[in-house]
């Protein structure tokens, strides 16, 4: 019988975290929750602690810690509360932990995710920004520590499933011609370009196929999410940017494809539900029930494909340029995008200005080597300062 695996879920109150806990709860004989982290939804984190009884819960600061401790005491729950980035790194690298779900959104997830990698854990990577910001450093840490890195983004998980087990020999060595990264096109795929200046945060967050958090929903609407995924794919699979092609596929049934030199194209299909890649990574190399309904091909009936419109979605072009430039450019892209998306959600800028701000910041910030994590965060900080300066001049 398989030994019970102890899991740390970073970002437990978000969409990926909750889906992870749903899969874990279906297999109590296989998985036990070791630690959970949350950021603003402390009441929800409390409810999850009562339900899953983790050894630890991590919150951002002392005020949240006091509130959570009081709730845990009232519920008779023995979970110990830790604080801040140090607490996140502690539960990510703890000797008792077998696997870490890295689902904290944005740059905030980089250090704890890297802590899990450096401790040699099985890392379920949902935090694409960690690889976007620090790709070379991150992958070197994976090689050095012997960590097992399994992608959670549905597209990268699909690619992982379509590649041979020895793809780390090099894509050309295993006969791969190119990777086809699918994109739904988001909620504005057919919106007249002239109308994009008037779309609201609520419209941007109403994705036609996926249930996601607000930040990633806006990224999907701008297609920056696909741009970040392109950069992530380059690092995960050691692919040159020109070997990763984005294909718009509105139904979100084919999650990505791998094109081989013999003319074969392998694809992974499934209903658009994140529990599928989560279950795949949790159980890899085995398979477990995820709770996702079987795919009904007769109900789908048709699958459509088209090329992405980079005039409508300039974020995709900017991300590809950052991937080609390398060095600090992806970290700058990511930081500027985080500030821009937050400003859009706060109604301080219009939707097309997300790309406009990012392009200006990329033009202003020189591309420099990032040989250390400190250098990565320095580039990130400079980009955020330039973004805020742009907002002061152009924001509402």
Curated annotation (Swiss-Prot):
It comes from the Bacteria. It catalyses: 2-C-methyl-D-erythritol 4-phosphate + NADP(+) = 1-deoxy-D-xylulose 5-phosphate + NADPH + H(+). Mn(2+) binds at residues 153, 155, 229. Transmembrane segments: none annotated. Disulfide bonds: none annotated. Its EC number is 1.1.1.267. Pathway: Isoprenoid biosynthesis; isopentenyl diphosphate biosynthesis via DXP pathway; isopentenyl diphosphate from 1-deoxy-D-xylulose 5-phosphate: step 1/6. One of its GO terms (molecular function) is manganese ion binding. The keyword Oxidoreductase applies. NADPH binds at residues 13-16, 127, 129, 213. It is an enzyme of class 1 (oxidoreductase). Keywords: Isoprene biosynthesis, Manganese, Metal-binding, NADP, Oxidoreductase. Its cofactor is Mg(2+); Mn(2+). 1-deoxy-D-xylulose 5-phosphate binds at residues 128, 154-155, 184, 207, 220, 225-226, 229. One of its GO terms (biological process) is isopentenyl diphosphate biosynthetic process, methylerythritol 4-phosphate pathway involved in terpenoid biosynthetic process. Catalyzes the NADPH-dependent rearrangement and reduction of 1-deoxy-D-xylulose-5-phosphate (DXP) to 2-C-methyl-D-erythritol 4-phosphate (MEP). Belongs to the DXR family. HAMAP family: DXP_reductoisom. PANTHER family: 1-DEOXY-D-XYLULOSE 5-PHOSPHATE REDUCTOISOMERASE, 1-DEOXY-D-XYLULOSE 5-PHOSPHATE REDUCTOISOMERASE, CHLOROPLASTIC. This is 1-deoxy-D-xylulose 5-phosphate reductoisomerase. It comes from Pseudomonas putida (strain W619).
């Amino acid at each position: 019988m398989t030994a019970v695996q102890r899991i740390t879920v970073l970002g437990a109150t978000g969409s990926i975290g909750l889906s992870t806990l749903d899969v874990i709860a279906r297999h109590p004989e296989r998985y036990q929750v070791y630690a959970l982290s949350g950021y603003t939804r402390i009441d929800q984190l409390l409810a999850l602690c009562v339900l899953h009884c983790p050894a630890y819960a991590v919150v951002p600061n002392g005020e949240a810690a006091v509130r959570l401790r009081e709730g845990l005491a009232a519920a008779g729950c023995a979970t110990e509360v830790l604080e801040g980035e140090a607490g996140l790194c502690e539960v990510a690298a703890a000797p008792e932990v077998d696997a870490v779900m890295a689902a904290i959104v944005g740059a905030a997830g980089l250090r704890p995710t890297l802590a899990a990698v450096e401790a040699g854990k099985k890392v379920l990577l949902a935090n694409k920004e960690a690889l976007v910001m620090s790709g070379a450093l991150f992958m070197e840490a994976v090689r050095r520590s012997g960590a097992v890195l399994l992608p959670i983004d549905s597209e990268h998980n699909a690619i992982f499933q379509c590649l041979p087990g020895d793809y780390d020999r090099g894509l050309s060595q295993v006969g791969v011609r190119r990777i086809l990264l699918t994109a739904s096109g988001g909620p504005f795929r057919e919106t007249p370009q002239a109308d994009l200046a008037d779309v609201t945060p609520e419209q941007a967050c109403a994705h036609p196929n996926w249930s996601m958090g607000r930040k990633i929903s806006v990224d999907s609407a701008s297609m920056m999410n696909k741009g970040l995924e392109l950069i992530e794919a380059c690092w995960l699979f050691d692919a040159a940017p020109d070997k990763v092609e984005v294909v718009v596929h509105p139904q979100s049934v084919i999650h990505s494809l791998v094109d081989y030199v013999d003319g074969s194209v392998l694809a992974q299909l499934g209903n658009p539900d994140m529990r599928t890649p989560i279950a795949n990574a949790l159980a890899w190399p085995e398979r477990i029930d995820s709770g996702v309904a079987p795919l009904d091909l007769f109900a789908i009936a048709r699958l459509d494909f088209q090329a992405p419109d980079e005039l409508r979605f300039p974020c995709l072009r900017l991300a590809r340029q950052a991937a080609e430039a390398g060095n600090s450019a992806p970290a700058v892209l990511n930081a500027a995008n985080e500030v821009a998306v937050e400003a859009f959600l706060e109604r301080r800028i219009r939707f097309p200005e997300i790309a406009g701000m990012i392009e200006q910041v990329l033009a202003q910030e020189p591309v420099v080597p990032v040989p250390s994590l400190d250098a990565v965060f320095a580039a990130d900080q400079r980009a955020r300062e330039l973004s805020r300066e742009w907002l002061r001049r152009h924001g509402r």
